[in-house]
């Protein structure tokens, strides 16, 4: 991109590093940023820096929070006897949109993926086992994506939790194989939660 100033090229390159953003989208975003007022651009930059500094993991669910417990773990209205295990925080948002699930969550921050050199020790599995071992949990719902890695992760966790007296279920397949929770509509997620099965 020799025809763009170096600072603009750098901005385009940074946007292009984001998942799902190709070269043309990165250019569009960069040009939009240039059209912002100085105050708007500063507000945008400050929001990125603030989110990076303040957003951490909930000490219980490993969901995202800006300090202390996440709102779901802090809510007395949630059923603490049921844990829904998801790959990442976007899946929490997707399931919450269904308004069907009233339990708590556990965010793994990924799935077991030998191809990507991600093993069980790279995920929030130990903290899940510790939660279940502490007692008071009746059911663990495996809500990882219905693709090869999601299935392998769910099966691994089911075996790991077998020694505990806890029911382990898997979301029903209203979600297509190879699909991702964050893209599922509310009705599909509701059916998947209602039709979960023991594994």
Indicate residue ranges for each PLM-predicted region.
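Cys/His-rich Zn2+-binding cysteine-cluster or related metal-binding knuckle/ribbon modules and their
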Residues: 2-8, 17, 30-92
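Catalytic cores of large soluble enzymes that bind and process phosphate-bearing ligands
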Residues: 3, 36, 40, 116-120, ...
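Long C-terminal interaction/binding lobes of large macromolecular proteins
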Residues: 10, 129-141, 145-199
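Alpha-helical structural signal
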Residues: 12, 27-30
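Signal for well-folded cores of large energy- and translation-related assemblies
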Residues: 16, 34, 49, 74-75, ...
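Extended interfacial segments that mediate partner engagement and assembly in macromolecular machines
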Residues: 26, 75-144
